[in-house]
Amino acid sequence: MEELKKAIIKQVGEKPYLNEEYPKLIAKRAYQNIANEAEEYRDRIVFGGEGSEETLKYSPTIIYPVGINEPIVQHEIFGPLLPIVKYKDDEVDALLNVISEREHGLAFYIFTKNKRWAKKVMQSQQYGGGCINEVCLHLMVKGVPFNGVGHSGMGAYHGIWGFREFTHPSTVLFGKTKMNLSLREHPYNKKKKNLLSKFLK
């Protein structure tokens, strides 16, 4: 926990909401949602928990400890709140089962030195995209899609995937006005049937 605090301070200072380079939330309503949710866990905030509604900046906020069934870990936060769930090694499988039964997230990140376990975990969950021992970098990889799944959004974007997702192909045929395809018209004699059977092969 202390290392996490140090990392935040190193990046954006002890009062990040006063840092000019620190980004703001998209709108006043978004700021209020984050501030209100943080306030519900005021007694468990171990870092942050402050901001400026005027600038719409809210500091990265660590909330600990949080239970896996508490409201804050059952929805996408879309803000700088980090709830931390404590668990024991022998509780990991049960925890993953709980996660897999919920709405699928846009991203899924795990940190481990065990490659075999990492592969097993990544294959056991559904998510838009993910990383092992990293965050967000999968969004920057050229030539692969960025996508959601279920509640986090359907479809894939970036490159050719984005083009296909946001376009709708329509087939249009220009017919000749000077000739008529009599083959398709009644009566269907033997000659027409033979020709049609060749077209259909």
Explain the meaning of each model-derived region.
Residues 5-36, 50-57, 74-79, 142-143, ...:
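Flexible, acidic loop-helix segments that line cofactor/substrate-binding pockets
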Residues 43-53, 65, 69:
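Conserved small-domain helix->loop->beta segment predominantly found in fold-type I
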Residues 36-42:
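Basic phosphate/pyrophosphate-binding loop/patch that engages nucleotide-derived ligands
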Residues 9, 58-201:
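Conserved C-terminal structural/oligomerization subdomain of aldehyde/semialdehyde dehydrogenase
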Residues 4, 22, 195-199:
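Generic structural signal of hydrophobic/aromatic residues within well-ordered alpha-helices
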